[in-house]
């Protein structure tokens, strides 16, 4: 690791301690009560400095160049809101008739593990692991050992806390790192997976190349990728607005097309085994339903709490509540700006899903050749 990279990590770790304090043991909106106000304002400013509405090439280049710091700042300010609305697994899933939200999330993770061929005894890398919800679920489901890679110190602290609490401290571990420049030796892992995380990379070729490097020959990489579909037209202003809303609200420097992802996998050396948009289906309940506010899609009584928090109406209530907390100085300044950014994301995700311009679950399963050096 270069001296510059080490300095950045040390600075980020120190900032995370100053910002979050003891809030790692809290979850959801209650964690906002334990933040350092000045540090929170700084984190929000760091994230929003690249989001001024500009979508030209120069603005995109600035965001791509600052992906590490921007993504780190993004998750410093949104993690508590994600947990409040979504729980410990920060991803979407398909919904089957009669299936609860929690069941659908676990099934989505199990399906990826199954397609990757993860088994007991495997050493597996989770690229962009969040607070470790999928890592813990896949570890329990398969019996494998999972190493979660993350560039956000707060999420790593929370992941370790949850793993210890659930008795998985020896099976699921967490490492701070940049997925564009991993610290692992070549050919370390039996399997690698990523769930809606590598979209934060400045280039698919860069992150997929690192995954290829740390994977053993014959090993498998499985990913649910966020991409714009083949219906997307970069020159169409409405299409670009949808993509920008997703970028702004989800901390993504640039939304790429499915072709860019597919070509990147092949270019770095992978053999693509599965190439399937899991969102392109006739499911009666769409993957984006929790964001819509359409009560007819609710499948079980257990989903009411999640739906109230994540629906359009629920988000408006949350926005008003956070604004009140900020006014009363119970929540740090900048919290409302975070909620507004997440609202932009929700609008873009629903619009992208309904128009089939965007998918959060482009499934690629790819193998590193046995003969690879």
Swiss-Prot record:
Keyword Nucleotidyltransferase: no
Pfam family, one: Methyltransf_11
Functional pathway: Steroid metabolism; ergosterol biosynthesis; ergosterol from zymosterol: step 1/5
Entry annotated with the keyword Methyltransferase: yes
GO BP of this protein: ergosterol biosynthetic process; methylation
Uppermost EC category: transferase
Keywords: Lipid biosynthesis, Lipid metabolism, Methyltransferase, S-adenosyl-L-methionine, Steroid biosynthesis, Steroid metabolism, Sterol biosynthesis, Sterol metabolism, Transferase
GO molecular function terms listed in the Swiss-Prot or TrEMBL record: identical protein binding; sterol 24-C-methyltransferase activity
Gene3D superfamilies the record matches: Vaccinia Virus protein VP39 (3.40.50.150)
Family the entry assigns: Belongs to the class I-like SAM-binding methyltransferase superfamily. Erg6/SMT family.
Protein name according to UniProt: Sterol 24-C-methyltransferase
Organism the protein comes from: Eremothecium gossypii (strain ATCC 10895 / CBS 109.51 / FGSC 9923 / NRRL Y-1056) (Yeast)
Taxonomic path: Eukaryota, Fungi, Dikarya, Ascomycota, Saccharomycotina
